[in-house]
């Protein structure tokens, strides 16, 4: 056991986590040069295309250290995005230490801080590594100072390496062996194994990634899942090198996979404990805190026949993604679908893309909303995440919106732009600290403003240099109303949104004009209106296409023309009563992109 090292790699987006893990794998001979591909661990197509890590992946490598001993390194490559921070905390639960990778050119960014604090809260040893020292703009000394100044961990003798060119990779491996403590646990005791991750394989059933805390799990052992009490047989156990490799047993302190032919999708939930069926452990291990979805949106299959497949796909995805929440929903405009809870907008995009690619579904998304706390006049408090579920105005005593605390790190030359943006988004500044060239800003912002397009706007006002992380703090009373869109007098439930009272005029007008562009012209006039309650705020008409019915009257009497025109008018009137308007997919998405 003293030769095992479990660690995670944590860093801000694009500071080189996945490239560093590639080098570690190559250095330790996990894959031959021929099998090597850039970002080996990013196995999903989406991850490769966007160049981001979404799922944490684990790898077991053998490393011959300078002291002549061979060490087993189990490491987990983690995502850097705000939306996936739960993935990071999950991987950290399986480790004793973490490598904090910092780009020697960019320096410390918000996510570096957020992930590092998560690790320090779990009492883990954090080892700083300065990456990308081959870049011309790299300034390792300044960055080492920044780490000490902003993060507060010793960094003067931090390892310097370049994952791209392979400089200093040996030093990184040595530091891991020296500075990260070996796992603790009782190899003789009853089995306790923590499920870090699981996914569904159509041939093998549920595959679970586990970290053995105490005891030993052998191939063929009978074990039970502690939360459900179900018993299974360990058909295969093994490790990822990063190829799936079968072994005969997993020992205390190791990280590996178990396949037990579990067919039902929620048979082995993430964060659960496995133990032997006979003489097992009495108590489960402390799991993970459940993450609450922050943003909700409706997803509907374009053809109603896909509803069943959509449900199966969501079930399979939710096994792999513990933060996904969903419940059935019906909409008069879009039919049957699901209301799904996400951690943020990136998460929402990724899930929609995975559903469309991996399960061949075609989906329509409605505008995302956050959860509001509503105190009704009868004293009851309810939580609403769907504009259609909002009670009648006269039943609402008070409406409270979620407020998040946002930490923004930005170079001082862009400070003014960022402050202007935060004020525009109804933010309240609570703190501002200068660290050398960087400024740390703390704002309290309404979550609804942050999840819509705050991240994109922040990046564009600061030329991509600002970085942010946020967490929910409380609900606060606010003047919020529901804005409805009426098409020919009918409410379209999928276009409703909850917004601040001060914005209804501008938002209503913008939305109505956008709809006017996007809804195709019909043979009759269409009225598009924005309303709050029964009060109409903005309106625009989509003019009818018109056939020239008098073209065939050459010369002739005016009464003849009048007769034809009146006949056309009657027809249009009849059409308008029975005609219904198709709202295209772009119109639903327009709600998201109002500020452009």
Curated annotation (Swiss-Prot):
GO biological process, one term: positive regulation of translation
Protein origin, superkingdom: Bacteria
Pfam families, per the entry: EFG_C, GTP_EFTU, GTP_EFTU_D2, LepA_C
Stretches assigned to the tr-type G domain: 2-184
Topology class, membrane: Peripheral membrane protein
InterPro entries: EF-4, EFG_III/V, EFG_V-like, EFTu-like_2, G_TR_CS, LepA_C_sf, LepA_CTD, LepA_IV
Catalytic activity: GTP + H2O = GDP + phosphate + H(+)
Major location category of this protein: membrane
Enzyme Commission designation: 3.6.5.n1
Binding-site residues, GTP: 14-19, 131-134
Compartments where located: Cell inner membrane
One annotated Gene Ontology cellular component of this protein: plasma membrane
Gene Ontology molecular function: GTP binding; GTPase activity; guanosine tetraphosphate binding; ribosome binding; translation elongation factor activity
Keywords: Cell inner membrane, Cell membrane, GTP-binding, Hydrolase, Membrane, Nucleotide-binding, Protein biosynthesis
Protein family per UniProt: Belongs to the TRAFAC class translation factor GTPase superfamily. Classic translation factor GTPase family. LepA subfamily.
Stated role: Required for accurate and efficient protein synthesis under certain stress conditions. May act as a fidelity factor of the translation reaction, by catalyzing a one-codon backward translocation of tRNAs on improperly translocated ribosomes. Back-translocation proceeds from a post-translocation (POST) complex to a pre-translocation (PRE) complex, thus giving elongation factor G a second chance to translocate the tRNAs correctly. Binds to ribosomes in a GTP-dependent manner.
Protein's name in the database: Elongation factor 4
Species, as recorded: Shewanella pealeana (strain ATCC 700345 / ANG-SQ1)
Gene assigned in the entry: lepA
